[in-house]
From Swiss-Prot:
AMP binds at R53, T54, Q88, D119, Y120, N314. The lineage of its organism: Bacteria, Pseudomonadati, Pseudomonadota, Gammaproteobacteria, Enterobacterales. This is L-threonine dehydratase catabolic TdcB. In the native structure, TdcB is in a dimeric form, whereas in the TdcB-AMP complex, it exists in a tetrameric form (dimer of dimers). It comes from Salmonella typhimurium (strain LT2 / SGSC1412 / ATCC 700720). It is an enzyme of class 4 (lyase). The gene is tdcB. SUPFAM superfamilies: Tryptophan synthase beta subunit-like PLP-dependent enzymes. Catalyzes the anaerobic formation of alpha-ketobutyrate and ammonia from threonine in a two-step reaction. The first step involved a dehydration of threonine and a production of enamine intermediates (aminocrotonate), which tautomerizes to its imine form (iminobutyrate). Both intermediates are unstable and short-lived. The second step is the nonenzymatic hydrolysis of the enamine/imine intermediates to form 2-ketobutyrate and free ammonia. In the low water environment of the cell, the second step is accelerated by RidA. Pfam families: PALP. The modification N6-(pyridoxal phosphate)lysine is found at K58. It catalyses: L-threonine = 2-oxobutanoate + NH4(+); L-serine = pyruvate + NH4(+). Each protein molecule can bind up to four molecules of AMP, which act as an allosteric activator to the enzyme. The enzyme is inhibited by alpha-keto acids and other catabolites.
Amino acid sequence: MHITYDLPVAIEDILEAKKRLAGKIYKTGMPRSNYFSERCKGEIFLKFENMQRTGSFKIRGAFNKLSSLTEAEKRKGVVACSAGNHAQGVSLSCAMLGIDGKVVMPKGAPKSKVAATCDYSAEVVLHGDNFNDTIAKVSEIVETEGRIFIPPYDDPKVIAGQGTIGLEIMEDLYDVDNVIVPIGGGGLIAGIAIAIKSINPTIKVIGVQAENVHGMAASYYTGEITTHRTTGTLADGCDVSRPGNLTYEIVRELVDDIVLVSEDEIRNSMIALIQRNKVITEGAGALACAALLSGKLDSHIQNRKTVSIISGGNIDLSRVSQITGLVDA
């Protein structure tokens, strides 16, 4: 028996996405972390989406969206824009489904993410310096080539695909008390919140954003969609200054809280994951654990069971060396 909410995505959409994704993606592991459990005085489980195909959760939403296109739409080809993880998810999904794909990435995108996107199948177009520049280029491609745009987060099928993580959490740890989720544009937390709250509304779903870029948190607390970005962040995968319209609506309705973490807290979380759990994550992937270590969630997590989403691990090795040389865990 599921609880139904009057929202753009329902638990039924996520269950349908699970069927589409069966055999196409990994059901990622979710082990208990002794280190984080001891530090946080609760039971902490890490959901390793950095071990997912393409190195992040993004393939879930990308494949669900692409596989739901009509045959006529598939023949037109698709286009997406991304700094990395969505690009890789779309590129691999195109290869799996036999769809011609084109991805627009900013000129400053990490070299490893550009290379991986090319390797999976899609044609990569490097354009502009930021998300607004890439969106403008995508609009031009849609107009001139007739391709179908695959949004990175603000789309019901994309949100439903990301929500399959919530189903896996409930399958593996039904008595979980809290789920801590990184936020960029909001697709991941929106999908997870629908899945979790439809099954058990007493479970808390808490978001985490970087202090430097927190459009969703600013919108959540002011009650209207707004933009927030002061400068860049180590969590470059979550460097989204304005949330999506659909994702904001879902987050406003279902998410229990959003906390902010500093750049030092993100860095220390990345180092702790490497040193204590032998796990390499990108900055965005370390956001949830940064919130756990910060003490800002102590009232929620002490003596309770908490899942922390490690959303991705696509980071240049040179960047890892730079980060680990700055701060001790």
